[in-house]
Amino acid sequence: MSAITITDAAHDYLADLLSKQNTPGIGIRVFITQPGTQYAETCIAYCKPGEEKPDDTAVGLKSFTAYLDAVSVPFLEDALVDYATDRMGGQLTIKAPNAKVPMVNEDSPINERINYYLQTEINPGLASHGGQVSLVDVVDDGIAVLQFGGGCQGCGQADVTLKDGIERTLLERIPELKGVRDVTDHTQKENAYY
């Protein structure tokens, strides 16, 4: 497999699990939720015949087929699925070192580039106050619609953070962006930092 390695021990463990499903042709589907973000999670699920997606990459293994989610494939590069026995029986492990690595460039869609800068440059600073900001939408006029959460929701400094920090950073990095707009309900102040 090019993007992911499934060890013999993991293959045998998964093949045993699949054989107990009493579904001819059942395989696994490997995907990453929220790939390229700090929230990325690598998942393996049963995949009955017909449940695979049309753009999945089918990888034929000795006893079953592994379907790799098309969006997840670049993030599965160098991933390893292994099974290790221990005193309690054993554990299936998935190591995907690139799952949280953003993969954007100047040609990436604007929403992906905004999310990249929010996750890599802006949210790490907001985290020191227990806050974060997320992209809700990019409207037709080139405005990024953002929503604060955590310690930033209801914070008295949110306007300053939005204009002097977030907007300035995003406009420097993404020239076609025209501005940002906050849609947070700042009347909720119970978690506010200031």
From Swiss-Prot:
GO terms classed as biological process: iron-sulfur cluster assembly; protein maturation
A Gene Ontology MF term for this entry? iron ion binding
Q: What does the UniProt keyword field contain? A: 4Fe-4S, Iron, Iron-sulfur, Metal-binding
The entry marks the following residues as binding [4Fe-4S] cluster, namely 152, 155
Which cofactors does this protein require? Answer: [4Fe-4S] cluster
Database matches in SUPFAM superfamilies: Fe-S cluster assembly (FSCA) domain-like, HesB-like domain
Kindly state what the record says about how the cofactor is bound: Binds 1 [4Fe-4S] cluster per subunit. The cluster is presumably bound at the interface of two monomers.
Query: What does the subunit comment say?
Result: Homodimer.
**What is the recorded function of this protein according to its Swiss-Prot or TrEMBL entry?**
Involved in iron-sulfur cluster biogenesis. Binds a 4Fe-4S cluster, can transfer this cluster to apoproteins, and thereby intervenes in the maturation of Fe/S proteins. Could also act as a scaffold/chaperone for damaged Fe/S proteins.
The entry's family comment says: Belongs to the NfuA family.
Q: Which protein is depicted?
A: Fe/S biogenesis protein NfuA
